[in-house]
Every structure is written in structure tokens, then in C-alpha cells.
Amino acid sequence: MPTLQLLWMKWRNTKKIADSNKLKTMKERINYSEVAPGALKAMRELEKYVAASGLEHSLYELVKTRASQINGCAYCLDMHTKDARVAGETEQRLYALSAWRETPFYTDRECAALEWTEALTLISENDVADNLYDSVRKHFDEKEMVELTMAIVAINGWNRLAIGFRTVPGTYKPQ
């Protein structure tokens, strides 16, 4: 990851800590599922497509958790770490996810998916270079690339809904 990007991420995280008092009293702005049920239905259809795509469930949960870490979505982090645990994910891998490059805990395929997740989640800050695409493609066929990308699109959409409307974390119960 380029040094400038790391510095920006550190600054952003520091700013979030400084704003934490505001978040402790967080109140939901809009219950979007009640106000616009059609919007929720559209997002759920995308989620159904991705869930049925054939991507490994564990991979999908890692992607959702990593994008939610980057975006700072507390609600989605609460949800997806709970779902990952229920599905058998280890605490070690969940705790190390933000530093996945520094650990031996993830497969090459998972690392490729996490790298693609970071690139697309931070797309306004990065170019999605051909060498990155080629590297990820070694682990995913064309259909899987589309499915992985749709998974990243979906979680980034959910993150923006939850952050924008301040969906309060802590109430999600895995099924």
C-alpha cells in the first residue's frame, strides 16, 4: 500500500477517534427499510445473487468484514463478524483481518480477494491497475471475478446505507 495512502488512513482513523463522543450517542437518522422498502428489496436481491453465486461463504464474509473495516461501518462490522463466527471463522483470522498482508492466516485466493476488495472500496484514491487485476485473475475465473466484484459492490452499498442513516450497531442476531 503506498505510504501516502497509509498516512491518510491513519489520519482518518485518528479523526474518527476524535469524533467518537458524537458516535456514543448515535441515533438512527432514517429507518430506510420502512421509508423505502423498495430500496431494501433491491439491495436484498443483489445480496441473494451474491450469496447464490458460488463464492465460498467464508471468503464472502472476509470481503464484507474488510470493506466494512475500511469504511468504518460499525453496524456491518458487528453483523459480519457475528455471521463469520457462526459460519466457523476463527477469532485469530477476524482479529488479524485489517493486517492480512502481515500474517500467514489467509490463503492466496483470500489474499487476492482482500486486495481486490481494498482496491475497489478505495477506488477514488487508487487506480485499479492492470497488474492488480492480473494478479487477482490468477485466483478467480471471469465469472468469479464478476461475482467477487458484485460482492464488493453490495457491501459498499450496505455500508453507505448504514453509515449515512446511522444504523445503530449491536442489535443484529445471526440466523
Predicted segments, located by residue:
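Hydrophobic alpha-helical segments
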Residues: L6-Q175
